[in-house]
């Protein structure tokens, strides 16, 4: 069992993810949104690359069945029902609904991971549940950090480290690449999370948009026991 880490969506190639269990992380905030929505009874989440595609697909549904969610540059998209705040995806809003979603980084990363054997959605809020499931799979793993506009993102990296750290507590003989070892070490040295992620560029962007409550929620550790999986068409509860 080997664990590798990809530092942003720009570095995803078919040969890296092919036949691997792929774990996609966009902690601030797409994968936190998806995990929250699925946990709150959302029937499925369907990710799209573009706003136009999302709006076009929405026409195929009855308006009472579907919710449009997402962002561009961390801001709600005009004409959409919800932004990319996980706090908006309450049980009252999403239960039994289909969420059509497009985001700047997260949905792009998901689309590029399609050659993977399985595609798991992870965030800080469900990290332990994901780690447990990965150990059950006992396959080679690639943790994909969505990153920010193609660049490395500190928040995704420490989240991956938390997952690796949790796995190592149960299975010590996992083979780690240098970059996955470093991810684990970063988490080991920064278990309070906030003092680390506050140095991240995306954290500053969120603070400037007054998204402090989203930050507080997204850095909570393993408060959700659900593992969403993407089958190339839709994201559902595993």
From Swiss-Prot:
SUPFAM superfamilies: ComB-like (SSF142823). Keywords: Hydrolase, Magnesium. The keyword Hydrolase applies. It is an enzyme of class 3 (hydrolase). Its cofactor is Mg(2+). One of its GO terms (molecular function) is sulfopyruvate decarboxylase activity. InterPro entries: ComB-like, ComB-like_sf. PANTHER family: 2-PHOSPHOSULFOLACTATE PHOSPHATASE-RELATED. This is Probable 2-phosphosulfolactate phosphatase. It comes from Clostridium botulinum (strain Alaska E43 / Type E3). The lineage of its organism: Bacteria, Bacillati, Bacillota, Clostridia, Eubacteriales.
């Amino acid at each position: 069992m080997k664990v590798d880490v990809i530092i942003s969506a720009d570095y995803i190639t078919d040969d890296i993810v092919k036949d691997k269990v792929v774990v996609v992380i966009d902690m601030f905030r797409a994968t936190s949104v998806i995990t929250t929505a699925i946990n709150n009874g959302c029937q499925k989440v369907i990710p799209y690359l573009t706003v136009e595609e999302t709006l076009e697909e929405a026409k195929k549904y009855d308006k009472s069945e579907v919710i449009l969610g997402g962002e561009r540059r961390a801001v709600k998209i005009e004409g959409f029902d919800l932004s990319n705040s996980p706090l908006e995806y309450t049980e009252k809003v999403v239960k039994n609904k289909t969420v059509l979603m497009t985001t700047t980084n997260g949905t792009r990363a998901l689309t590029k991971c399609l050659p993977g054997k399985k595609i798991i959605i992870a965030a800080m809020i469900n990290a332990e549940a994901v780690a447990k499931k990965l150990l059950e799979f006992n396959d080679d793993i690639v943790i994909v950090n969505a990153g920010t506009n193609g660049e490395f993102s500190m928040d995704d990296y420490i989240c991956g480290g938390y997952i690796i750290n949790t796995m190592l507590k149960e299975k010590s003989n996992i083979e780690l690449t240098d970059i996955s070892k470093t991810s684990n070490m970063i988490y080991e040295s920064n278990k309070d999370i906030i003092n680390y992620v506050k140095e991240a560029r995306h954290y500053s962007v969120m603070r400037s948009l007054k998204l402090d409550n989203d930050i507080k929620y997204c850095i909570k550790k393993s408060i959700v026991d659900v593992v969403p999986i993407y089958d190339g068409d839709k994201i559902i509860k595993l």
